[in-house]
Amino acid sequence: MDDLLSRELADLAALHRLAPLMSEYLPNTAHELRPAALAAVVDEVLLGSRTVLVECGCGASSVVLARLLARRGFGHLLSVEHDERTAAFVASQLRREGLGHVARVVHAPLAPHPAALGNAHWYHPQLVHDEVSAFVERYGLVDALLVDGPLLGDARYPALPVLRGVLAPGAAVLVDDAERPDEQTVLVRWAEEFALRFRTTPRTSLATANALD
């Protein structure tokens, strides 16, 4: 079975598993998590009893995760998104579904960042600092970090230098698009700098690791 067919079958199976959380149609935004990757994230939240989630890059997946947390009865999600249109849609959908008590979207435009590689931009430094600090102060250390933005792979590098200090021991770090060269470069650097061991599942395009104590 070739890789493309394997991925497509994995996505079809994931859509079936995700059906209980698909109460209504959600449009795909740019660079949305594939169904197989989203199902893997949902599994991690449930099996790992994750309760304090931060997501870099939001979309339909943010709404699905918020539905999961609301139905489970505990947990909170903070999503950071640079695209104003996407952030506005997700925030509006969360309000419309009454999910504002479990999930919040922050529109953080891209800007120069001291932790960025080369001339890459990341989310606005002060805005991210303020929002994440308030989130952690209210709900505790982050036990699941999902990195699916910004769009360009090496632009994602600052996520761990910036957020490592608010990760709980054993926190899950999940990175989408792990098969792309830029993401692989970032994963290698993170593994070396933060003593992480990433595992990549080709059918999901997701790399996962657990933060050390």
List each language-model region with its residue ranges.
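Rossmann-like AdoMet
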Residues: 1-32
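SAM cofactor-binding core of SAM-dependent methyltransferases
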Residues: 31-112
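A conditional alpha-helix N-cap/helix-loop micro-motif detector
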Residues: 31-35, 125-128, 153-156
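A generic local structural motif
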Residues: 39-41, 129-135, 158-162
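Flexible, charged surface loops at secondary-structure boundaries
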Residues: 44-49, 71, 136-141, 166-167
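Generic enzyme active-site microenvironment
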Residues: 53, 79, 146, 174-175
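S-adenosyl-L-methionine
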Residues: 91-140
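C-terminal substrate-binding/active-site "lid" region of AdoMet-derived donor-dependent transferases
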Residues: 138-139, 143-144, 150-213
